[in-house]
Amino acid sequence: MNMSQKMAAEFLGTLWLVLGGCGSAVLAAAFPEVGIGLLGVSLAFGLTVLTMAFAIGHISGCHLNPAVSFGLWAGGRFPTSELLPYIIAQVAGGIAGAGVLYLIASGQEGFSLAAGFASNGFGEHSPGGYSMISVMICEIVMTLFFLLVILGSTDERAPKGFAPIAIGLCLTLIHLISIPISNTSVNPARSTGPALFVGDWAVSQLWLFWAAPIIGAILAGVIYRYFNAAK
């Protein structure tokens, strides 16, 4: 596959992740009165990755996440030359996904971006009121384990064909743990799209949801290299 094909796949895949994951939170979490709730939103995020892994995994590897690209790079599984193009495509896809979601959601009477639009936050903008430090630790640790699952399940020595399931279930588990803490990022592209529409506090806090996932991902890549060095 050439780079334009890979970038197109990453763009569409990340658009689907934001539309499916954030869309479930914005459109369905509290509908009609009970809605799908935390469990449903968590499953939605996992399902977006699982479905796209089968759809575009053979084209781009289905990163859909700058942290995943950084983690694979740190683990020696992704070339430096492709890092920036992938991240550009992922961020563009995240913004486009948020744009499609906004076009849909804004058609409902009473819709307001003030409700958060599935943005990530800390302090008063954390769903559970968690501090910046708590959110930082959570995002680093969650992304670290996410990347360990990705690196391990896609290793040539791992059982074939099960990686999308393991990765999708891992992302679901991560959301079950961390939605109350940070609204769950582990993905700078997922955070960027909604934040740009909300503006204000969501943009001012966006730095954490770039820094923490990338730190966690790189740590996972280093750990993965250590495991392989022991072979």
Swiss-Prot record:
Pfam families, per database record: MIP (PF00230)
Which GO-annotated molecular functions does the record name? Answer: water channel activity
**Site, as annotated: Involved in tetramerization or stability of the tetramer:** C22
Q: Where are the transmembrane segments?
A: 11-31, 36-56, 84-104, 132-152, 161-181, 203-223
The GO cellular component terms are: plasma membrane
The UniProt site entry described as Selectivity filter is assigned to: F45, H175, T184, R190
Q: Which InterPro entries match?
A: Aquaporin-like, Aquaporin_transptr, Aquaporin_Z, MIP, MIP_CS
Q: Which reaction does it catalyse?
A: H2O(in) = H2O(out)
Q: What is its main location?
A: membrane
Q: Which cysteines are joined by disulfide bonds?
A: none
Motif window: NPA 2? 187-189
Q: Which UniProt keywords apply?
A: Cell inner membrane, Cell membrane, Membrane, Repeat, Transmembrane, Transmembrane helix, Transport
Where, per UniProt, does this protein localize? Cell inner membrane
**Domain notes for this protein:** Aquaporins contain two tandem repeats each containing three membrane-spanning domains and a pore-forming loop with the signature motif Asn-Pro-Ala (NPA).
Family, as annotated: Belongs to the MIP/aquaporin (TC 1.A.8) family.
Subunit details: Homotetramer.
Q: What is this protein called?
A: Aquaporin Z
The gene from which this protein is expressed is: aqpZ
